[in-house]
Amino acid sequence: MHIVCLTFDFDGISGFMSRGQVGPSWLSRGEFGPRVGAPRLIDLFRKFDIQTTWYVPGHTIESFPEAVKNVIDAGHELAHHGWTHRPPASLSAEDEERELIRANESIKKISGQYARGYRSPSWDLSPHSVKFFLKHGFTYDSSMMGDDYTPYYARQNDVIELEKPAAFGNETPLVEMPIHWSTDDSPHYEFVRAETSLRQGLKNAHHVEQNWVDDFHYMRETVEWGVLTYTCHPFISGRGHRIMVLERMIQQLKNDGAVFMRVDQAVEAFKRRQPQV
């Protein structure tokens, strides 16, 4: 079986706010997601009868509740993406856990249940993250890059010192659903001009489509069973030509035998196939 998980980091305006980009023009870019991009994507997935996973910051849930409710009502998974969209590695242990709890309460308030899955803003966990996920009942994370097509059980308590060999910690029950920047729409598409840097983005969407389809073909040719996770953002991939490319890609992958699942469903399929010893 070759599984595809389409995932969406539903940042709203929180990603810009977390970087101090709070002017009206910056925030309008994020607002496009709940106002325009998300409804388009929900309609697209209804057309193909597939379910996806949306990682949503608490700030987005509290600021755009109707947009988030529409995601839930369409049958998609609502998962955790922090509260302020600040990466855990930038927070103290106390603030990291506080944000984890606060956002999970927002998720329960709107959906009726706590999140099972977590994805770090900016894919930057702290040394404490896995411990907190286990403590608060998460079954999976999707923030690390230790594989491409095979989920694995995350470790904790690694000891990493510059001039010593790595001392790897113990395996935990937390399933890691690996991701990578090459299958994230943001570095390919998003134009970001800051005071001291410029990320051009705005790549040809057809080239991105071909790369992403090729990643699936490689999985199909090299592993008997695997999961490929694509990461998108409603304010990025919800625009004209990009959503057309996404539609074509879904059709191509379906034709090529892809089985589309929510991430929580793929986690359960992995655990059945490879139960922890």
Model segments located where?
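Active-site beta->alpha N-cap acidic-glycine motif
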Residues: 1-77, 252-254
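Short, well-ordered coil/turn segments that N-cap beta-strands
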Residues: 1-4, 48-52, 74-77, 111-116, ...
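Conserved, mostly hydrophobic/aromatic
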Residues: 9, 45, 78-81, 118, ...
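Acidic-and-aromatic substrate-binding clefts and catalytic sites of carbohydrate-active enzymes
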Residues: 30-35, 53-65, 86-96, 119-128, ...
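C-terminal domain-boundary segment and adjacent tail
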Residues: 47-48, 202-277
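Long, hydrophobic, well-ordered secondary-structure blocks that form the structural core
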Residues: 62, 75-134
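Active-site-adjacent pocket scaffolds in enzyme catalytic domains
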Residues: 108-109, 113-224
